[in-house]
Structures are given as structure tokens and as C-alpha cells.
Amino acid sequence: MKNFFVSALAAVMTLNVSAAKKPTARLQFEALKGVAGSVEMPRGRVNYTAFTKLYYVTNVEDTTYQYMNVFVPEGASQQSPIILKTNVGGYMPSAAGNPSVGDITGMALQRGYVVAIVGSRGRTSYVTKGKKKIYNGKAPAAILDLKAAIRYLRHFDKQMPGDAEKIITDGTSAGGAMSALMGAAGNNPAYEKYLKAMGAADERDDVFASICYCPITDLSHADMAYEWLYGNTDSRKANDTAHRQVSQELAALFPAYINSLGLKKKDGTLLTANNYLGYIKEELIRSAQIAKDAGAEIPDSIGFTFNSDAGTFAPVNGGMPDLGKLPRDMAKNLKRDGMPGGMGKRVGEYITDLDMTKYLNYVANKTPLKTAPAFDALGVSGNEASGENDEFGDVNNTPANFTDYSAGKNGTTVSAKVKEEEYLLNPMEQIGHEGITVAPHWYIRHGSIDRDTAFPVALNLATKLENTGKDVNFLLAWNRPHSGDYALNELFNWIAEITK
């Protein structure tokens, strides 16, 4: 008994010393500490119970960000799906917030879903030790925090309302990349050493579905994809000689990459550099046709061609049947392919072609293109470094190159540390690999006028997921810039379908 008390006292003293050195938080959930709240929605007030500042690791390094807030609407149960929202943008730190009428969270509560808004560290977050700033939010901190939050929800699944086997992640831009990672990197052992050191729960971290708006991902190949797509636009041709050369050199690297992926279209056609632009064109035409059928005016001045009887504008709804009245399998094919199998095109109703040169110039004129290279700057000091260079920086806040091309131009090589971080931040490198659990359901959107990253980034992600048997709802959303959480009624109809 004496030894027991001595050991207990020693443990308490150790705990107090540790607490003095670094903030700590117990991994706990107290069901009786919920606070009543509400959010005003267009259709009325939604009441909820809020559980705030739920620290999802025991070794908390940053008390500003490493926790989440969970909101349980009236009527929710243990079976209610959980919407996990990340507000990460630009790979910056993201605080756990409150539900909003302006994004997925408000409507999720209105529809009876539990909402978890997760805070996470980012590339500019730091803690102070003595007089020194330690930047502890560089890659892969954000995805580690988010994975730890998933483990927390699963750890307390029986105590908390909501079904931890029905977690649906949502994010936009870099947050879209985080959502893609949560969906693509479930239970990957490569993260385990980090999560263990953080004091994350010893649980699975796979999820049920991922919603990814304009994901800024596959950073290792994003520069080459960007220049391959936009390198022949008038904007790029107007650049100085040095930047034109960079653009051309990067564009020349993309064919080998796309050929190496072995991606296939739905009909089994192998995608290569020779037919990939046509693949993008098909997706843009599909998006424009959906918009036209809903009543949007699609001008021929941006590159579209309509059959001769249609003139400039096709008829509203284009003679297309109501999707809600079709069998589910036919409606699904219609959404993806533009018309159900066996239904031929009717005269005057369909977009027939798209001049990609004209269309890409249109996109570049809507919003100026990024300077080449778009992501991994040739100079990585001071203002020359990109946000992505900063993301791969070190604890001293020194940015780093992360591609062989830009590192080579700077006379250096990509370090082993950065290569590991690249892998941990890239869903494309994890999908389809043994020992990793990929979410079965995906909702991926990239705007048809979004030039923040090139169309192939999101399209490759969607195609690779489809090729590995996942359920993917993908669209180059018509006339959408770089943005997220739009067309929420459509999104929640999809959520209702996959969770019923």
C-alpha cells in the first residue's frame, strides 16, 4: 500500500512538472457538459447542444488549435451521420468554430446530422519556448490533427451522439486536400509514429465519405499539370523569355507523369498524354450541358459548339428527362455521361464540341494565372517563397523546395524529410495501396473557371478513385471559381442517398 501511495505521489508530481513545461489535456468527453445553442437558418432556428474545446490528443502542443467543437441538433441519435468540417485554407492554421448558415454546417444541423468542426495547426502556427518561436504547424501537422480528431470521435462513439462509422469529411482548397487525405489515408501505418507521440486515441482513423471542393493536392506534380494545361494560353505567351522557358520545361514533364498513372476512362480506354485533353473537354462539356439543361446560357464565344438547329443556346432542359423520375442506375449514368444509355441525341439539344484553346484563354482572362512555377517557387527565401514552400518548411520557419525541378534550379535536392512529408500530404500516392483504408464514397468538385490548380489535379483524384472501385460523384462545376460548400441541396441529396 505504501509503495502504491509513493508511486501515485510521484505520478502526480511528474504530471505537475510536465504541465508547467507544456500545456496538456486529458482525452475525455463529458456528456453532461453540453451547452444549449442555436443557429438561424432561412427556414427557421435550429437548436443544438454544443460540446466545445474537446482536445483530441493528450500531448497538446498548441491550445489555440488542437481541439474541436461538436454540435448535436435536437433529435440526433447514435445513428446520426457526423459531418466533420475543416476550415483549413492555404495550409494555414484553422480554429475550431461555430456552425454557420453560409457553409455545410448549418444545413447539416438542420437536417439532423451531428457536426464536428475541427481546429488544426497550420504553416504559420507556432509555440514559444523561452524567447524562441517553434513553428510546429508545418507538414504534416494539419492532417495529423484531423486524423487525431477522427480517432477521438471513434474512441467516444458510445458516449457521444452520432455514428463514428458514418463520418463524412468536408473541406475547400487546402481544406479540400485535407478532406481528400482523411478519405484516402485511413489507417495508413506511416502516420502512426506521429499520432502516438501526440497522444491520439488508439483507434482507426478511416472515414465513410469525403467531400472535397477544389482540393489543392498532388503538389509534387501540380506545377507540371498547370503549365501543361495553361502553357499555350495568350497569358503565358506574353510572359518574358525566362518564364516562358520555365513553363515549357514544366509542361514537358507532365506527359510522362500522366502516362505512368495508368488511369482509365469509364469505358476502359487508357488515359495518356495523347487523349487527356480530350478527357478534360468531355468533362467540361458534361458540366456545361448540365448547366444548360437547368436554364443557364452558355455562349459560343468561349469555345462551345452547338448542333446547327440549336443556334447559340440550347433549349432549357434540352429535352432531358427528370432525374428524379428515372431508375436510380439510369439517373446515375445520366449525371455522369450526359444522357442515359440507349437515348440518342435529339436535334437542337446538345453541345457538340469545345475549342479548348479558346476556353482555356477564357479561364485565364477571368482570373490571372499564377506565375510559373505555380506552387514550388524557384526562389524559396523571403517573399519569393510560395505558401506551399512554407508548408514544407522547418521549425525555424525556413521554407523548402519540394519538387526535383525547382530544387534543381536552385542547385539543391529535395530532402528526405520533405519527401516523407510530401507522401503524407498526397492522397494520390496512397489510394489503392495495401494496408490503407480508403473511404467508399466521394463527392469532388472543381470549378470550371477555377485556375488555382489545374483541372487534372481533381480529375486524376476522381479517376483513380473510380478505377479502384470507389463511388465517386465528380463535376467540374459550371462557372464556379475557387470556392466551396455550394449547391448544398444537391450535396445533401447525395449524403442522404449514401447514408440511408
Task: List each model region and its residues.
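N-terminal cap/lid segment of alpha/beta-hydrolase-fold proteins
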Residues: 23-78, 412-424, 433, 464
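C-terminal catalytic histidine-bearing segment of alpha/beta-hydrolase fold enzymes
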Residues: 222-226, 263-338, 343, 443-450, ...
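Mobile cap/lid helix-loop segments that gate and shape the active-site cleft of serine hydrolases
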Residues: 52, 185-196, 201-204, 276, ...
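Primarily recognizes the serine-hydrolase "nucleophile elbow" in alpha/beta-hydrolase
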Residues: 155-232, 422
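Short beta-strand element of the alpha/beta-hydrolase
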Residues: 68, 78-91
